[in-house]
């Protein structure tokens, strides 16, 4: 939903010769900040979230396992959301291959993790749970370097609360 609001605004800035880099940087930083807080809250609230979604697990080992796996993997939402924003930047410049490779990278990492876990006799569930955030980091690094090659080096920082960023939040906020 955020990207559905971001991409048209970003594309308009690119076409109009406006400060597209500044807008992208502010959107990246703002999204990263909000999602970092959201990820921390979600991780801390994981027992409640598991209970709300799988109350049948309460009172047995599945509950604790679901909480553990949820806490490990919840940060993926931060990484994949930033990947989506960077993919929107790339798509605006007609660079579709990089963004379309992101899910392939996830599949490759999961296959590699399962093979490694089987060979090393690791716990498969924990291996796959840890593969989720590691995959998010790899996907973010891949799209970040792709955007950098396109001339967009977006580093987290304090976003400037410009009228455009406020408009973006108003449009994307309800979703």
Describe the residue ranges of each PLM region.
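Membrane-embedded alpha-helical bundles of multi-pass transporters/translocases
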Residues: 1-175
């Amino acid at each position: 939903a955020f990207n559905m609001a971001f991409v048209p605004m970003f594309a308009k800035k690119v076409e109009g010769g406006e400060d597209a880099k500044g807008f992208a940087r502010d959107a990246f930083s703002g999204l990263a900040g909000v999602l970092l807080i959201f990820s921390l809250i979600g991780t801390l609230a994981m027992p409640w979230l598991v209970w709300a979604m799988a109350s049948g697990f309460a009172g047995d080992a599945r509950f604790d396992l679901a909480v553990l796996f949820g806490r490990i993997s919840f940060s993926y939402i931060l990484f994949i959301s930033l990947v989506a924003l960077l993919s929107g930047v790339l798509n605006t410049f007609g660079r579709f291959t990089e963004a379309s490779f992101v899910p392939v990278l996830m599949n490759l990492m999961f296959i590699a993790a399962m093979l490694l876990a089987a060979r090393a006799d690791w716990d498969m569930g924990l291996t796959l749970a840890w593969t989720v955030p590691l995959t998010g980091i790899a996907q973010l690094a891949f799209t970040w370097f792709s955007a950098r090659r396109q001339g967009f080096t977006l580093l987290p920082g304090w976003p400037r609360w410009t009228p455009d960023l406020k408009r973006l939040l108003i449009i994307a906020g309800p979703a």
